[in-house]
Amino acid sequence: MSCKAPGEEIAHKTTLSILNKLAHYSWDAKAVLTLAAFALDYGDFWMLADLHSSDQLAKSVGILKRVPVVLKRPGLQKYGKAIVELNNLIKATLEVIESVFELEKLTVYDTKDVPALAGAMDRIPVDVYWAIITVVACTTQMCCITGDEGKKQELSPFAQKINVILNVLRRTIKLAHEQIDVIEAYRKLKKIFQTPSEVMEVFKALIFHKDAEPSLIDGSTNKLVSIDVLKKKDVLLFISSLDITIEEISILKPVYDGISKKDQHKIVWIPIVEHWTDELRKKFEVLRSKMPWYTVQYFSPVVGIKFIKEEWNFKNKPIVVVINPRGKVEHPNALHIIKVWGIKAFPFTKEAEGVLATKEDVMEDIMVGVNPKLPVVIKDDRYIFFYGGKDNEWVQQFTKKATALANDPAIKEARIYIELVLVGKNEKGQDDVGILGRFWDKMESFFFSKTEKKTEPDAVTREIQKLLSYKNESGWVVLSKGSKVIFTGHGTTVMKVVDEFDKWKGYVREIGYEIIFKQYHDKVIEVNRPCSRVDIPFGVGKIPEHMHCPHCPRVMETYISFKCCHVDGALNSLH
């Protein structure tokens, strides 16, 4: 890089010439070799300047390189500012080249795991070009200063560009290291969970960074405690975002009350927040105050967030992961069985779920909190119509006609007792969205619990799947005998069966009420069979890859839809 006349065009041509000569070198090597060539002259100059007054040889060589021109008082006054500008720009350019080197080292990671690297690697040729052209411009400026010709190379455009590039590289490298920390934590956790040894080891690796002081807040005393309280315990990890409701928190309170008596099981809330703010901390404190169990108070991103999302299918909706004292996962999400069976699902393991999933008498557990008189009716083993729907007119018509059917002499003479339970109404007969929400939430939880097994769905599961497909229809009906689900149907077809009661009531004594009801309904749906559609909320956990229709042997089509109820926390669904 010999002295050239100042000017951006000349600097550009010189840079292209350098790139051409170094064509066979990597991009980071191109930048380093160019900087090394400049450093040779630049370093010589300042070394000679340093030794100028004490070494005769240095003084003689310095005269040849025009060092005194710069060092003498007029030179310092004339070129002092330019020298500082030059020095600062070289330092910034050196940092750019070092950053390019660091990015090159990080290419051992897949860009799928470290997305920050994807665009950064594409920008490296451009960044190196600007590093080299800046070095060329600095060389020209050095020649102008030592030549004392009154000319100068304008460096401010190069300084602006280099500083922009440097800021981008700093942010990229910082983000890349954060993403690498996540992937390394993920790999570490996978290894730990393959050969677990103790629940506390798993818990620390899942939540805290190395330099953090792990602790919990005891919700019953509001005091900080050591994580040693989890030692040799079965731990229920209640994992959620801050967008949870009091209703969702209350689901765990009966479980907490039940397990607190024996002190072997502990519940710990792990809030998942990627970027904490003062507002989110306030929200955290409000939610935490509602929980009597332990809480992780750690205002940094959870170390194992990638593991939680990918291995436990966390999608911002609450999950409950059950871990035994040895650190082994006993259930990746026991929240479904807790919603349906509560403390009856104890100890909340896959084995416990397997036992519960074989039960056919589920309506009593699902209807807890819906109708206080219901347990008595269920224990009497009576037939019950549970019904509801979007169309109030259909609801009124069904109430009227089903009541007439229940009171018909043919039913009374056969000693058949039928009760009607309208879901979604409180004791005063008013609409209650909370009751309806709990009903569908429990139905969905029961269905997901049953479908996680890789076996053919049983009769009850198929009936619940049918019911879920009617969730947004004008009307729907569940017929149970006591707590056992007998039948579910669409409002339109069930209404027709009830309308035409006179045509089949003569068979009630001979065949049996539930059998003839189902047989006649099967006859009706041969003529009028509505489409079946099952909505699966996006955050429930692992979504089935495919689903068979509950009405026919076909595989259901898959659609994606989006839903907003105009409240915080948009409800995304997969259909």
Region spans (language model):
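Non-globular targeting/processing and membrane-anchoring segments
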Residues: 1-268, 272-274, 279-287, 329-575
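Short, surface-exposed basic-aromatic patches at helix termini and helix-loop junctions that form
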Residues: 285-290, 313
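Metal/cofactor- and membrane transport-associated sequence elements
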Residues: 320
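Short linear interaction motifs
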Residues: 217-220, 298-317
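Short acidic-hydrophobic, aromatic-tinged amphipathic segments that line or gate anion-handling sites
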Residues: 293-303, 446-452
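Short, acidic, Ser/Thr-enriched surface-loop or helix-capping motifs
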Residues: 323-324
